């Protein structure tokens, strides 16, 4: 089970985002919802796809990737692009293990996404969409000053905006 492609496209339409833009995705691990099916369909509809490459200092950047390309494996055992064309996505799909109605997320604690979103928002406006299962909702996520609020949370049942 995954999020609705129809609902994701509603979000894109709301911001008048058409194909030929970069969508930043992720390779799902553990309990993260799988976004690869959505990304594959988007790529077939002429959206450009990118995936993160993480570094040992808890930083990451996004790199152009296509389903025709191979993937390497990083120091944590997570598949990553072999390509080295760094880009800044226009829309960033964010993984999570928990979320609340205020659109804050709980990750694995490394701060990769919070740091990346904070850095990129200084350079350009991006749309952030957390992908989640509805059962991952928590009444209130404990937040600190580094936590980044998402624009949307898209679950298998609804859009939270």
Regions found by a protein language model. Give the residues of each.
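Residue-level signal for inorganic ion chemistry
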Residues: 49, 109, 153
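N-terminal active-site beta-alpha-beta segment that forms phosphate/nucleotide-binding
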Residues: 1-87
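Surface-exposed, charge/polar-rich loops and edge strands
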Residues: 87-92, 101-104, 115-161
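Charged helix-capping and loop-helix junction motifs
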Residues: 40, 108-114
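Short, basic/glycine-rich phosphate-binding loops at helix/coil junctions
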Residues: 62, 95-97
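Short glycine-rich anion-binding loops that position phosphate/pyrophosphate groups of nucleotides
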Residues: 29-31, 97-101
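Conserved residues at the C-terminal ends of beta-strands
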Residues: 26, 95, 156
């Amino acid at each position: 089970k995954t999020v609705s492609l129809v609902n994701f496209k509603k979000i894109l339409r709301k911001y008048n985002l058409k194909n030929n833009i970069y969508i930043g995705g992720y390779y799902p691990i553990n309990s993260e919802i799988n976004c690869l099916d959505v990304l594959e369909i988007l790529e077939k509809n002429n959206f450009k796809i990118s995936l993160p490459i993480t570094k040992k200092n808890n930083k990451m950047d996004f790199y152009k990737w296509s389903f025709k390309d191979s993937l390497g494996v990083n120091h944590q055992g997570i598949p990553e692009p072999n390509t080295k064309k760094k880009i800044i996505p226009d829309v960033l799909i964010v993984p999570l293990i928990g979320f609340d109605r205020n659109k804050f997320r709980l990750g694995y604690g490394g701060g990769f996404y919070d740091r990346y979103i904070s850095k990129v928002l200084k350079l350009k406006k991006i749309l952030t969409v957390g992908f989640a299962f509805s059962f991952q909702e928590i009444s209130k996520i404990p937040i600190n000053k580094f936590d980044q609020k998402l624009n949307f949370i898209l679950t298998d049942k609804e859009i939270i905006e």
